[in-house]
Amino acid sequence: MKASAFVYPWDVNGDPQAAGTIAAIGVQQVTLASAYHSTRALTPRHPRHRIVTAEHAAVLYATDDRWQGRELRPYAAGDWAPGDAFGEAAAALTDAGLEVHTWVVLAHNSRLGAEHPDTSVVNAYGDRYPWAPCIAQPATRAYLVDLAAEAAVRPGAHGTELESLGWYGLQHLHAHDKTGGVGLGDAGLYLMALCFCPTCREGYGAQGVDADELAAVVRAALEPVWRGAPSGGGWAGVEKLLGASPAGATRAWRDDTARTLQEAAVTAVRGAAPAGFQILLHADPVSYHVGANAGVDPAHILSVADGVVVPCAGGTDLLAPFAGAVGAVGVAGAVGVAGVAGVAGVAGAAEGGEVSGGSVIAANFTVVSGMGGSPGTLASDAARARALGATELRLYHAGLASDADLEAVRSALAGL
């Protein structure tokens, strides 16, 4: 079972032992960050530092001239990843016998929101989410599509994994975060993710919903939740709060917006990439979910991309809808796919295209014990994932993990 470990360039650059250490755990591939959000990261084995602070979202390579004269453009990294940090790390990892794929974080950029506040998601209360670019806005979409193509197709890379290629919402580990005081539940979080920027207001209008009335309904529906009432779970909970018709209108707008962006980004990457370049999306099989693992329709996304990376830190249940879509190989459009959508808890099916029987379904496990991971159970977790249809493993994160964690991973992979 092929396994790939996530890595940052700063884990490798300046440490002549790093690439060999990663190769020794038994992975065949690394997923190396080329565009990444702000973070504070541990480097437990690096000879020159122990903590890296990436102060803002940045590309970890030198950009080309496609960004000349454009208001929205990627930011260069500071001293945490100077110059072509990606290229330097990729060369070392390749020399160690590892296949390098890019790791590209897209619609998640707090500096972009701070410097261009009009690009951000605006909730029903008028609060902006600077970490969450609104993916409906034309200029933002153009920026994200071009960033996907440039950051994905780096010299020496054999494929890419596109993260945050969809809506972002309230859920976000912000600096000294204090947003957990009231449990909003799945439905409440959806309402708090609804955007009311001018573009989205027009989008709701095109669905027959007045944006001002919708915002008022959202605020009224959330008022009992702020006072402690449960919001309900799943899409039924959203419909209970908003009403079935308004809820459906918001979802139609948002699903189509995300779907067309994903199609455009994958098309742009394919246009820039050599033959055989693999394109995966970090994805959640519930289309109204938001965050780093974009909500998708499984059948649709597997007809667009070469596969998905599925979060399994909380269990492996999210694999089944994607495996079900692969099981529908050869069935195009809505024929035979609606049942898969029902399993996923999503509405609609792929329109055109076919799901490939060779689609990658990568189960993503956290293997850093200090971050809630369980490297000691990786062998059994991988077996469970394989039984549910996973074809590959993703391991988060080789640079952050302790020596003991890496040894547990090595032992598990040796037995697969």
List each model region and its residues:
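Catalytic domains of carbohydrate-active enzymes, especially glycoside hydrolases
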Residues: 17-40, 154-159, 299-308, 387-390
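Short, acidic/polar
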Residues: 10-24, 139-150, 289-301, 374-384
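The substrate-binding groove and active-site-proximal loops of carbohydrate-active enzymes
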Residues: 4-12, 65-83, 128-142, 247-257, ...
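Substrate-binding cleft of secreted/luminal carbohydrate-active enzymes
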Residues: 310-318, 364-416
